[in-house]
Amino acid sequence: MSGPDAGPTGAPAGGICAVVLAAGEGTRLRPLTERVPKALCPVGNVPLLDRALARLAGLGLTGPETVAVNASYLGEQVVEQVGTRAHLSVEPDGPLGTAGGVGRLRDWIAGRGVLVGNADAYLADPAAPPGPDIAALLHDWDGDSVRLLGRPAPDPTAPGTFDGHVFTGFSLLPWRLVRDLPPVFGDLVRAVWRPAEADGRLTVVPYPGTFVDTGTPADYLAANLHAAGDDSLVDPTASVTGGCHRSVVGAGATVAGEVTRSVVWPGATVDAGERLHEVIRTATGLTVPAA
């Protein structure tokens, strides 16, 4: 549908909302996530959650009537980070999974199609800014089928693939499949995606850019290095008097030693004489190898 009554990228006006899933514990990223929720871990000096919200804003999806964020693990930090930018759904008894998180928001979704994004997905397309880079997911959607953003899988027959593609963080769900999701633990793969695939009602929309699932320290480092490009990415408020090579240095950090292919979190310190290589250094002094 297009024309003056159309919403983002051709979707019916008022017919699309978005949910960012930010409730997970990030167990594979521990110990980085022992004090900071995975959704707030910075990539390229920007929290992953803020990257997701910026991508939605690039599609014209903003504000608490249109965008929701769920929270559970260290949820108070997520709530503070979101502020008034989105509707908040706090899961007090632990994360409800991807399906349960959406199911808990049924009254808020209220008949709309819903664009569901994983806060921990890092996406970057040099040909398009955040938002327009995933606009094909919404373009000419029929409002009834399921769409997944994906990229070709190295092994198209591997478990977990959809039509030979690996899921890359965003899906589009019709209300008819959302309205019956219970607010109990469950995942979208089994509750929605596979049944829709079996019914011939699932389509994969290829994503042409880079995707990194930041689930492990190695992948988290890879996402940061991609965000930095061929050089280092240093926040203007950081102090770097040592060496900095292909690294990301956050706000208020101090680097007097030498860092190579590493991430220095906001407020962290690398003392003179220290040499960091392929690690993440946090503000508490924790050093996590990315190998």
Positions of PLM-derived features:
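Catalytic-core segments of class I nucleotidyltransferases/pyrophosphorylases
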Residues: 113-117, 122-147, 152-228
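Gly/Ser/Thr-rich beta-alpha loop segments that engage phosphate groups in nucleotides
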Residues: 25-28, 99, 171, 217
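Extended beta-solenoid/beta-helix repeat architectures
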Residues: 222, 226-291
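Conserved catalytic-core motifs of eukaryotic protein kinase domains, centered on the activation segment
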Residues: 31-34
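Active-site regions of enzymes building and remodeling cell-envelope glycoconjugates
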Residues: 84-89, 157-164, 262
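Conserved N-terminal catalytic core of the sugar/cofactor nucleotidyltransferase
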Residues: 2-21, 28, 42-127, 281-291
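A generic "binding-loop/recognition-motif" signal
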Residues: 25, 36, 74, 210, ...
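Conserved beta-strand segments of alpha/beta enzyme cores
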Residues: 39, 85-87, 201-203
